[in-house]
Amino acid sequence: MPTEKRRQILDIAARYGARNVRIFGSVARGQADERSDIDFLVEMEAGRSLFDLGGLQADLEAALGRPVDVVTEKGLKARIRSRVLREAIPV
């Protein structure tokens, strides 16, 4: 990922209290195409809300020009949790 994009993603994440930003899914596996969304796994600062998570998602989509999903470890479904944690790569 280009350094400028990485910095932009991390700046947006910081505005919403998101840390430890990681990518998982088809982008992390190198299987993405132009229709693929980008899946982000984040840790949110204490006191942050779903509004922060939603704002983060909207701003990332605007910046990247692609659909984005943002989840926390708590928000991961049990059946995919171990796979996501295994394949997640830091931004």
Role assignments for model-derived ranges:
Residues 10, 48, 89:
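Basic nucleic-acid-binding interfaces
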Residues 1-21:
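Helical scaffold of the NTase/Pol beta-like nucleotidyltransferase catalytic core
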Residues 21, 38-40, 68:
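Conserved beta-strand core positions
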Residues 85-91:
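Short hydrophobic/aromatic patches at helix-to-coil boundaries
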Residues 3, 44-75:
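Metal-dependent nucleotidyltransferase catalytic core
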Residues 25, 30-49:
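Catalytic metal-binding acidic patch
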Residues 6, 20, 50-53, 77, ...:
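A general structural signal for well-ordered alpha-helical segments in protein cores
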